[in-house]
Amino acid sequence: MKNLSAFVLLCLLATALLPHSVHAQKRAYRAPEFAYNWGKPGLHPDHIVLNMPEDPSTSMSVTWRTSVDVQAGYAEIAIATAAPKFWRNAKTYKAHTEILEATDIPRAEVVSKYHSVTFTELLPDTTYAYRVGDGRIWSEWIHFKTAPDGDQPFSFLYVGDTQNYIMELWSRLIRAGYQKAPEAGFIVHAGDLVNYAHDEGEWHEWFMAGSFIHRMLPSVSTPGNHEYYPRTEEERAQRIRSLSVQWEPGFTLPDNGPAGLKETVYYLDYGAMRLISLNSNVRQEEQVPWLEEVLADNPQKWTVVTYHHPLYSASSGRDNQQLRELWKPIFDKYQVDLVIQGHDHSYARGRTEPDKNQLAGLNMRDQYVGTAYVVSVSGGKMYNMRPDGWDDFKGATRDRGAENTQLFQVISIDDDRLSFEAYTATGQLYDAFDLEKTAAGKPNRFIERQDEAIPVRTHDNTISYYDQLPDGVTEKLEAQHPGFRVISVTYYDEPEFRGYRVLLSDDEERLVLRTDPEGNVVK
C-alpha cells in the first residue's frame, strides 16, 4: 500500500510539472497596471541615460529628466578610485536644459525638463564616476568607462525590439545581458524601444526596466517604426508620422548625420570599429550620399551598421525590397562587415556572397563571406519565421533562426576577429559565428560555430506563445467559415467575459468570434 501511495504521488507530481497545454490554455495573463502618475517627472533626476559622442574615447554624454520645478541642471565627474572621496577631484558642468511641452499630445500628456551634458577631455579606457542633479538634489554616483584608444579588444551588447511587455519581460532580458557581459562597452538598441512613440508611461517602463544599466552602459539607439506616430489629429488625417517627442530631448546622440535626420542617422568610432546608425523609417534615399561619404572615409578595420527594418526579413509575410535595393549595393561596395537589425520579432542570421569581382568563383558554401546580417528580438512579442528561410532572396542564405525566444547578443572585436554570440534570456548560447579579416580588399573568412549552441527553438518545441482552442474547435470554426483560417486566439478570464477571442482571416477580410471556455460561439 505504501509503495502504491508513493507511486500515485510521484505520478501526480510529474503531471503537475509537465508543461501541459490544457493547463496553459486555461490561464489568462494578468498584465501589470501602473498608476497614472507612475511615470511622471519629479524633483529627483530620473531617465538617466548615457550616450556616446562621435569619439567616446575622450567624451561622453548624459541626459536626464526632472519636473519643470527644477530650475537648472548640473553634472559632476571625476576619475573613479577605490577611495570614497574621489569627488574631491570632480569637475562640474552646467547642463543644457530644455522643456518638453507635450500635455496636448495623446499618450504623452506631460510637461517636463530634460537636462544634458557632454563631458569632454576625458582619458581613453578610463573608469569615471559621475552624478547629476540641480546642485541640491543629486543622483547616486555612477560609473562608466571610456572607449579604448586604438586596437584594444572590446565587446558590446545588441538587442532587437523591446516594444511590448517592457517592464515585466524585457527587464529580465537586459539584466541577463549585463550579467553575461558586464565589461561590455555599450548597448545597441535596433529600434522599437516602445510600442507607442509618444507614450510617457512606456518610456518610463523602458528606463525602469534598464535601470542602472542605462546609466552605466551607453545606449546606441536607432528608431523603429513604433518610434513614429501622429502627434495630433491633423497629422493623423494627413497620415503624417512624427518621431517620438521624447527622442531628441531624452537622448544625446551624435549630431553628425544628414540635415533633418538629427540623432537618428549618425556614426561614431569605438576602438577599431565604425558604428553607423541609419533611419529605415523615413527619407531613406537622402541618407545614401551621407552613407557613401562616411564609408569612403573610414579608417577603421571593422564596420557595423544598425537600423530597424531588415534587408532580409526574418518573419513570414515581410520583405523590404526597396530598402534592400537601395542600401545593399553600398554595403557591398564598401565591404560592411556586420548589419544588426530588428522589426521582425523573431531571430534570423545569415550572410551574403562576396563580391565575385573581388574573388571569382566563390559560392555561399565557401568559407569566405560578404556582409553578415542578423535580425533579433529582445521583448516579449513574437512572430513566426519565414518557412522558406531566405531562399527567396537572391545571393543570401539564412544559417540560423529562432521563434518564440527572447535574445540578446554579445559582439566582441579583438584585432582581426569579430565574434558574435546570441544568448537566450536564461543565458543559454543560441548562436555563434566568427568573422576573420584576411588580406586587404578580400572578403572576411567565415567561421560557423552554431554547433556550440542549443538546438533550434520554434513555436513547436517551446511553451506556446499563442492561446490554444480546445481540441477540434479550430477545425469546426474553419469548416463553418469556408476560406477562413484561425490566425490568433486569446483567452480571457474577466468578470464580464470568460472564454476565447478568435480572429479568422481569408487574407482579404477578417472575422472576430467569441466562444465560451468549451469553444462554443457566443454573441
What residue spans do the PLM features occupy?
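Exposed beta-strand-loop-beta-strand "reactive/processing" segments of non-cytosolic proteins
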Residues: 483-515, 521-523
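Acidic, histidine-bearing metal-coordination/catalytic regions of metal-dependent phosphoesterases
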Residues: 22-158, 414, 419-458
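Active-site-proximal segments of metal-dependent phosphoesterases and phosphodiesterases across multiple
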Residues: 298-341, 357-360, 391, 396
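Short, non-transmembrane alpha-helical segments in secretory-pathway proteins
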Residues: 459-488
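Bacterial Sec-dependent N-terminal signal peptides
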Residues: 1-26
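Extended active-site neighborhood of metal-dependent phosphoesterases/phosphodiesterases
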Residues: 109, 113-119, 127-143, 202-299, ...
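An acidic-aromatic substrate-binding cleft motif
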Residues: 112, 137-190, 195-196
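Active-site neighborhood of phospho(di)ester-bond hydrolases with catalytic His/Asp-centered motifs
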Residues: 158-160, 186-192, 218-225, 278-279, ...
